[in-house]
From Swiss-Prot:
Any single biological process term in GO: photosynthesis
Localization (cell): Plastid, Chloroplast thylakoid membrane
Name of the protein in its database record: Protein PsbN
Family: Belongs to the PsbN family.
Record function comment: May play a role in photosystem I and II biogenesis.
The species this protein was found in: Anthoceros angustus (Hornwort)
Lineage, broadest ranks: Eukaryota, Viridiplantae, Streptophyta, Embryophyta, Anthocerotophyta
Membrane topology designation: Single-pass membrane protein
Pfam families: PsbN (PF02468)
Amino acid sequence: METATLVAIFISCLLVSFTGYAPYTASGQPSNELRDLFEEHED
């Protein structure tokens, strides 16, 4: 394959993996470690 095709496939895979990892971090198993800043600073 040509170099441009491989670069396009590589960038596409990076975008898809980041798009899948972001919701997993926000609502999956690692979200238990996130802090709620609004609960920490109640006035």
